[in-house]
Amino acid sequence: MIRRPLFLGTLGFCGAILISYFLGKAAALGVLGLLVFAWWQWRQAGDPAGSNGVHAIRMQRQKLRKHGTAILMVFYVVSLVNVQLYELQRDPFAKLEETGGVMTTTATGTVLNSSIRTSGSGDEYLQMTVWVQRIGEQGVSRRWYERPVRLLVKQYPDRGTDFSDLTPVSPGTQLRITGKVELPTGRRNPNCFDYQLYLKTIGIERVMTAQTIHIKEESHSLQGWLFQQKEQYLHQLKGTAGESAAGLMRGILFGEKTEIEEDTLEEFQRNGTAHILAVSGLHIGILYGVLGKLWRGKKGWLYFWMVTIVLIGYSFLASFSPSVVRASVMIVLHLYAKVRHLRYDLGSASFVVLLMILLKNPMQLFHTGLQMSFLAVLTLSAAAPFFRKFYQGIFLSSGVVQLGLLPYTAYVFNYVSLAAVFINVPIIFLAGFLVPLGIGGFALSLILLEPTAVSGVDLVLDVAFKPVIEIMGQAIDGLCGLLTSCNSMTCIKGVTSFEVTSPPRALLAGYYLLLLLFLSEEGRLLILRKRKKAVAALICLCLAAAAIFGQVTATGFENASIVFVDVGQGDCMHIKAKDGKNYLVDGGGKIDYDLGKKTLKPYLLKNGVRRLDGAFVSHLHTDHYKGVAELCREGMVKKLFLYEGNRDKTGQICQETGMSAEDLVFLRAGQTVSLDDAGFAKSVMNDAGFAKNMSERVEVLWPEAGRDAGTVLQKRRQGFGTDNGSSAGEKKGQGSEEEDENETSLILKIHAGGLSLLATGDIDAACEDRLAAKYRNGLKTDLLKVAHHGSRYSWSEDFARYAKPQAAVFQVGKNNYGHPNGEIIENYQRMEAGIWRNDLQGAVGFSCRQGDTAAGKKRLEVVTMLP
């Protein structure tokens, strides 16, 4: 594989994209200079010495180096130019930068695809990709190299539209849409999902929330007609096969998972079989195989064009997903080679298709579906010939693909399935029946659903084919049931399926580079010829390249000892103690969203934390406690620390968190928790020497033992508190029970990584005054989590003066409470404290460098997700 010219060309093309994205244009040009220098050196090199035979071999190697470097350099330059043209795209929404990232406008355009989606809160909405032709009254012009301007439009219920309900819109429909256009959200926590980058991989730069949608012209395109037939067929399938089977077939045939039950979808993901629910090369291969069996004539040009047309039509239905495009183009290339009696090479064909895709949109290199698709086919191409010498059974292909995908799926999805190698065989076998049945049923529905012009023919067709469709629907129902049962039986959490932390990028890169080295034909030849020095040199080169890749792609949070996690309007602090121990202080939370499972759990797993040693909860309001409770239910927390006033709520807390009473630790002022032992809590009120010896610890400053506990507990409602970040209703119309809950927030002084952090929950100014009077200089801290998200009612001059933080962090998201208050920000700026905000900068991480500044302050190292 390595000797293929297209391998070197693809390597150069992808390298230019990666270097430009991670290091910038200057670094990309620097690498180009190195390539030119290497090529020039080899070009100027004289003839190597040696006997005739040795001389010929050395001449050949020198020629290969020169030509290989030239190929690498040419494709690298082409890719750099392509990336530059991509970045020169004119932005018709450039005014967004001047309006804080949001503007209201009217756009006219053509629908490219649409579907019904479900938000994290469980509400359905209509999502469309729209090709914009006009913005306001001004047309959108394009230069020859520019991409079409695409908007991702979201329309929620109860908005003024031409649609009586949420119904998918046919591609090709002309719409006039008024709404708010926004810059999509980027990655807000280290190593987590980057929504903005994902949209770029599918050619979308902006998101619009529709306020009004009006249809200008109905769709008359082929794609629109196919879309309508697809929706009608799936609606018909619900009647013959049932809603569950129809939802599964929507995923299997068209890659749309919106109607699959969440538990079923999660089982497929855990079991390593989720690829069956995303239209991929497997589906295209099955379709191609069926067409080949049905075609009885000579497989010449007529067969070539028939297959090409069918694949184009199916690609329309699958919205041209990267895996479908990859498989379809490779099949067309294979057929073309057969018709022209040319040699077909799987690896070279893969490289050709990848180059075509990246030439259109270089950002597609970061598309998960494309990465998995090409990893699978390239692993098959490189490794299957080697393993076929030892084993040729039914598990060969599945095992080889898992060899290529296992580390990647662990990195991206944080799952490892031991059953994937075996269960994929029967799953693919059943898919071999479901895909032809589904497509056959769709083809028959085209005949029945589209009326004819001949009188009586529709009735005849209905009588002839309706029973067939009924039988096919029942068969689909049975096969779908068998498919889900097989998958469910083998998906046993903790036995066949395991949650894992994401492996480091350097390890991931090293694995694939060494896999390529040892399984490629060229690498095996070096080993067989016992060229130990060459093999050792290549291994060192692979490891060095992997280390460089890991360093280049590092987020900067790897060395942070305290991270203020972005959970929106809520508090969450990640404390990294020595010996690899990890703690959270609060965990955010939203009433209608499982933030613990969908935000905190991915954050922890992707940053190397399989399970927290402990979690501290300041108080039981939703925006502090709910995320932690949800994380506990996922089995991610060993110990839970709360205020002792909550002791009589032990049963309720255990029910909400799924933890046992033995795992709850109740705290009060004067106690210290050692971060070396999460189960240890000791009163150190009169033992300052003991506390000083605990270098990494949590000191509980508030509330005092039994403070107002009886009053507070009498007033608390059952379940989660509902403060949600409001400053006790900003002191208006809020019941006193919410104020009492805030007043009894656990106030913690945390010492970790050479830094001190004062976590203040949602206390108000009166509480801060009491703390200032009691502790005075004992409040001195490096980092301050500003109380109550920066509410104007949570400012005390004395408290701030004694705390004297080097950095004040406001944990806020989008809100209607006016957080953070401008005067509070100015007050901390006046005290020369650095200001950091989750809503503007995403996650914020702090570490401490050796030595103090000239002013006696610690040297803080600060890293943020957003600039």
Show which residues each predicted segment covers.
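Core dinuclear metal-dependent hydrolase active-site scaffold
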Residues: P362-L365, N487-G614, G658-K780, L840-P867
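Transmembrane helix-bundle segments that form internal channels/tunnels in multi-pass membrane proteins
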Residues: M1-F93, T104, L294-K298, T379-V563, ...
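Cap/insert and terminal regions of metallo-dependent hydrolase folds
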Residues: K639, E768-A843
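Membrane-interface helix/helix-cap signal primarily in integral membrane proteins
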Residues: V81-H275, L525, K598, P602, ...
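Hydrophobic alpha-helical transmembrane segments in multi-pass membrane proteins
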Residues: L8, M208, E262-I423, L437, ...
